[in-house]
UniProtKB/Swiss-Prot annotation:
Molecular function in Gene Ontology: allantoinase activity; cobalt ion binding; zinc ion binding
Organism whose genome encodes this protein: Saccharomyces cerevisiae (strain ATCC 204508 / S288c) (Baker's yeast)
Residues the record lists as binding Zn(2+) 1: 70, 72, 157, 323
Protein name (Swiss-Prot/TrEMBL): Allantoinase
NCBIfam families linked to this entry: allantoinase
Co-factor binding details: Binds 2 Zn(2+) ions per subunit.
Lineage: Eukaryota, Fungi, Dikarya, Ascomycota, Saccharomycotina
Gene name linked to the record: DAL1
Record keywords: Hydrolase, Metal-binding, Purine metabolism, Zinc
Length: 460
C-alpha cells in the first residue's frame, strides 16, 4: 500500500496549531496516523511505516480540506452559468475538497429521485472535488422526500418566497408542518432560504432608483428574514413530536440573531450559517450600478456586518459558506446596472479561505467554521473536515505569509465575474490533496484528471 507523509511546524489538529506529521495512504485515500511534534525520521512511530515520500512544507500551514455546504453548480440545464467541471475546479483551487450542491438552478431541480438520477449522470467524470447533494422542498413533493433520503441526498432546502426560477416554487406554513412530520424519523435536515415579504408589500422601487444599491437594500429589509425565521420556529414549536434538525441558510441580518439564540437555548434543533460576502463586504462599499454585488438576502450595513461577526464568534452562527450562485454576465445586467432586474448571486467558491484569513481570523477558527461545522451539518463529520486517523486525506497547504490579488481573469468559474475582483488578500493555497492525491498546485493549476466522487452514503 503506497504511503506518503506530509509534515509542518503548523498543522491544524485538535483545535490547535502545532507541529505534526500526517501519514496517509494514496490507495485507500485515508489518514493512517497523525504524529504530533517535529518530525524525526528515526522516531519509532514513523519508522513502522514504509514511507514512499515525506514532504516538509514548513513554514506553511496544513489544514483539512474545506467543506462548502452551499454551492450552486447548475448542471444539468444551466451549464452556461456554471457546471460540475468548472465549479469543482474552482473549489479545489481554494482548498475546498467537498462541496454540497443545491437543488435549484439546475434543470431539472433535485426534487424527486428521477431528477436526482439525471443530475448524478451529469456529474459523472466531471468532479474535481467530492460532491454531496441537497434535495428540494417544493409544493406537492412530500411523497418524494423519503425516497430522496434513501437515494443519498444529505437534506432538503426550500424557499418561502420566489426563488428566481419557476421550476423551484416556494412553500408555505402547511407544507413545512407536513414535511416536519414526514422527515421526523429520518436522518436528514431541513434548510430554508429565510425571507418572507408581507403579502401587501411591494418590493419594486421607482425606475430611476433601480441603479441605487440603497433602493435594492430597502426593498428586502431585515423584517423579511425575521418574519421568515419566526414562521419556521413557530412550525417547530407547534410540532408535538420529534423533528429533524433545521438550518437557516445564508443569514444576512444581525437583527435575526436573537431569534436563533433564543430558539437554541430552548432546545430547538436550529443552526444557521452566514456567507463570506456578508462578513467581508458592507453596503456602504457597494457602488450604484455594481450589480455583481447583488445577492439575496442583500449585503447589509457595516454595523450589521460587525454584528454577524459577533454572532459567529459567540457560536450562534455556526458556519461560513460561499453560497456560490453564478450566472452569465448578461444576467447581471452590467451595462444597465439595474439591481432589480439582475440575477441575485455572488460567485465565490474557493475564495473563502484567504478572504477569512484576511479578516484576521485564526486558521483554527476557520477550520471550525468552514471544515468541522460544515461537515457536521452535512452528515460527514466522520469522514471530512478533520485531520485524524481514519478520515479522508483531504489536506490543504496554505502559505500564510504571501499575498495575492483576486481577479476575474484568475478565477476558475465558467463566468469570470466576482464581487472580489481587485481585492488583495492574505494567504495563498499552494496545494490541495483529495483523498491522498494531489489535485491542485498553485504552480501548475488543477490536475488533468477529475478524482472527485459523489457522497451518497447515509448521514452519520
Amino acid at each position: 500500500m503506497p504511503i506518503n507523509a506530509i509534515t509542518s511546524d503548523h498543522v491544524i489538529i485538535n483545535g490547535a496549531n502545532k507541529p505534526a506529521t500526517i501519514v496517509y495512504s494514496t490507495e485507500s485515500g485515508t489518514i493512517l496516523d497523525v504524529l504530533e511534534g517535529s518530525v524525526v525520521m528515526e522516531k519509532t512511530e514513523i519508522t513502522k511505516y514504509e514511507i514512499h515520500t515525506l514532504e516538509n512544507v514548513s513554514p506553511c500551514t496544513i489544514l483539512p480540506g474545506l467543506v462548502d455546504s452551499h454551492v450552486h453548480l447548475n448542471e444539468p440545464g444551466r451549464t452556461s452559468w456554471e457546471g460540475f467541471e468548472t465549479g469543482t475546479q474552482a473549489a479545489i483551487s481554494g482548498g475546498v475538497t467537498t462541496v454540497v450542491d443545491m437543488p435549484l438552478n439546475a434543470i431539472p431541480p433535485t426534487t424527486n429521485v428521477e431528477n436526482f438520477r439525471i443530475k448524478l449522470e451529469a456529474a459523472e467524470g466531471q468532479m474535481w472535488c467530492d460532491v454531496g447533494f441537497w434535495g428540494g422542498l417544493v409544493p406537492h413533493n412530500l411523497p418524494d422526500l423519503i425516497p430522496l433520503v434513501k437515494a443519498g441526498v444529505r437534506g432538503f432546502k426550500g424557499f418561502l418566497l420566489d426563488s428566481g426560477v419557476e421550476e423551484f416554487p416556494p412553500i408555505g406554513k402547511e407544507y413545512i408542518e407536513e414535511a416536519l412530520k414526514v422527515l421526523a424519523e429520518e436522518d436528514t435536515m431541513m434548510m430554508f432560504h429565510a425571507e418572507l415579504p408581507k403579502a401587501h408589500e411591494d418590493q419594486q422601487q421607482p425606475e430611476q432608483s433601480h441603479r441605487e444599491y440603497s433602493s435594492f437594500l430597502s426593498s428586502r429589509p431585515d423584517s423579511f428574514e425575521i418574519d421568515a425565521i419566526n414562521l419556521i420556529l413557530e412550525c417547530l414549536r407547534a410540532r408535538n413530536g420529534p423533528v429533524p434538525p433545521v438550518h437557516i441558510v445564508h443569514l444576512a441580518s444581525m437583527k435575526a440573531i436573537p431569534l436563533i439564540r433564543k430558539a437554541r437555548a430552548s432546545g430547538l434543533p436550529v443552526t444557521t450559517e452566514t456567507c463570506f460576502h456578508y462578513l467581508c463586504i458592507a453596503a456602504e462599499q457597494i457602488p450604484d450600478g455594481a450589480t455583481y454585488f447583488k445577492c439575496c438576502p442583500p449585503i447589509r450595513s457595516e454595523s450589521n456586518r460587525q454584528g454577524l461577526w459577533d454572532a459567529l464568534r459567540e457560536g450562534v452562527i455556526g458556519s461560513v459558506v460561499s453560497d456560490h450562485s453564478p450566472c452569465t454576465p448578461e444576467l447581471k445586467n452590467l451595462q444597465k446596472g439595474d439591481f432589480f432586474d439582475s440575477w441575485g448571486g455572488i460567485a465565490s467558491v474557493g475564495l473563502g479561505l484567504p478572504l477569512m484569513f484576511t479578516q484576521g481570523c485564526s486558521l483554527v477558527d476557520i477550520v471550525t467554521w468552514c471544515c468541522k461545522n460544515t461537515s457536521h451539518q452535512v452528515g460527514l463529520s466522520h469522514q471530512k473536515g478533520t485531520i485524524a486517523p481514519g478520515y479522508d486525506a483531504d489536506l490543504v497547504v496554505f502559505d500564510t505569509a504571501s499575498k495575492h490579488k483576486i481577479s476575474n481573469s484568475s478565477v476558475y468559474f465558467k463566468n469570470k465575474l466576482t464581487a472580489y475582483n481587485g481585492m488583495t488578500v492574505k494567504g495563498t493555497v499552494l496545494k490541495t490533496i483529495l483523498r491522498g492525491q494531489v489535485v491542485y498546485t498553485n504552480a501548475n493549476g488543477v490536475s488533468k484528471t477529475p478524482l472527485g466522487q459523489t457522497l451518497l452514503d447515509s448521514r452519520r
